Amino acid sequence: MKKALIKDTFREIKKSFGRFISIFGIVLVGVAFFTGVKSSARYMKYSADTYFDNNNLFDLKMYSNVGFDDADIEKLGKTEGIDRIEGVTSIDVITNVHDNDETVQIFSYDFSSDDNLNKITLTEGRFPENPGECVIRDYGIAREPIELGTELAIKDDNLKSTSYKVVGKVSTPYYLSYQYDTTTVGSGKISDVLFISEDEFTGDRYTVLFATVKGAKDEYCYGDTYFDIVTPVKEKVIENADELSEKYAMLGGYTFYALDRNSHYSFVDYKNCGDRMDAIAKVFPAFFYLVAALVCLTTMTRMVDEQRGGIGTLKALGYNKISIAGKYITYALLASLAGGVLGCVLGLLTFPRIIFNAWNIVYTVADFTEVPQISMCGLAIMIAVLINVLATFASCFSMLTETPALLLRPKSPKNGKKVFLEHIPFIWKHFNFTKKVTARNILRYKKRFFMTITGIAG
C-alpha cells in the first residue's frame, strides 16, 4: 500500500472514530468472552492439580475384603514405581445430625505428621488433642454446617469412644464437594466426613491403602501423560497382590482392588465441571464473533458507499484494486487487533477468577493457579481479525470491480419492490403508514435485519 493511502487510512480513522470504536468494541467483547471462558476450564483443572500436588492426593488406592496389615503394606510398597504408601482405617456409621439420623464416614489420621497422603488443612478450630475428639470436613456454605463443640454420639465396636466432640474443621483434597462416596450403611448416602486419631480405632488392620507413584506429581493430573505413568504401576500392584491371595487363601474368597483417580468421584466430578465450561466456550462466544462480522460488514459497507467518489478518483489516478481495498482492510485490521489484544487481557484478568470463585462455592480448591494462555490468545485474535478482514473485503469487492466513470457518478437508488407481506392483503392492509415503512426497512435491508436478529438471539 502506498504512503499516501497509509496516511489516508489513519486520517479516516480519526475522522470516523465512532465507527472504528464500534468494531473495536464488539471484537473486544467477543475475544474477552472467548479467552476468559475458554481459559477458565484450564485454570480450574490446573488449580486442582496444584492443590492435589501440594496436599499429596493419592495416585492409587487399594481395597481388599479382609483389610491389610503392616506386612501387606510393606509388600505392596516394594512394587516398582510406588513412591509412598500409607494405611488408613475408615468406617461408615450412623449418628444424629441436626435431629436426623445420618451416615458419616470416619477416617483415621496421623495428626502428629504434617506430610500425610491426602493431607488435611485446618480451616477453623484445632486438631484433636484428647480422646473422643474429632475434626470434620468443612464444606463451606453448600449445606448447614456442624458447629464446633457439637457432640456426636457414635457407637461402633471399632471405636474406643462412644461420642466425639467436633473441635475443628478441615479441607481435604480427597473430597472437593459435599458429594461423597456411596455406602451400604443407612440410606446409602454419606452426609459428613470425620477425622480421628489412629489410636481411636480398636483394631490393628487397615481398610484402605493410599499410594503415590514416582514421577506422577510432575505431570498434569488431568492429562494422558499422567495416566501413562500411573496405569503400569497399578497393573504391577495387582500382580503383586496375587501373593496376598495365597496368604489369605484359608479365609476363602479373597478379593483385591487397585484403583486410580479416574475411579474417584470427586476427581472426575471436578474434571467434568471444567469440561462443561470448555463446552460453553465453544458455543457462547460464537454469537459475539458473528455479531462482530455483521457489525464490521455493515460499518464498512456504509463507509465504502459514502466514499464511492473517492474510490473512483483513486482508480482514475492509477491505484490498483488491492491498494484501494488495503485502505479499508487496514482500517478493520487495526480495530480488530486493538480490540483483540485488549480483549485477551481483560478476559484473562476477569472471567477465570470470577468463574473459579463461583465454582468454589461448591468445591474446595484452595488456590487459583495461573497458566500461560499464549496460544489461545493468538487463536482468539486470529479468528477475530480473519472474520473482520473477510467481511471488509466482501463489503468493498463489488465496488472495486466497477469502472472509474461509474464510481464518479452518484449511485443509482435501488429499484422499488414489494416485500412479501404486501402480497398478503389480509395482513398488510391492517398496517398503518409507520408500520408499513418499518416492515419495508426491516425486510429490504437484510444485513441490518440479520445483525439485529443475531444480536438479540446472542
Feature names for model-found ranges:
Residues 21, 25, 280-283, 287, ...:
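Alpha-helical transmembrane segments of multi-pass inner-membrane proteins
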Residues 1-35, 329, 417-458:
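N-terminal Sec/SRP start-transfer signal
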Residues 272-285, 309, 313, 325-334, ...:
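Internal alpha-helical transmembrane segments of multi-pass membrane proteins, especially GPCRs
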Residues 8, 12-18, 294-334:
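Interfacial "coupling" helices/loops that link adjacent transmembrane helices in transporter permeases
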Residues 41, 45, 49, 392-405:
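Juxtamembrane/interface segments at transmembrane-helix termini
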Residues 293, 297-302, 309, 333-365, ...:
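Small-residue-rich transmembrane alpha-helices
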Residues 3, 400-419:
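Short cytosolic juxtamembrane segments of multi-pass membrane proteins
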Residues 2-293, 302, 321, 356, ...:
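Membrane transport/envelope proteins' first extracytoplasmic loop
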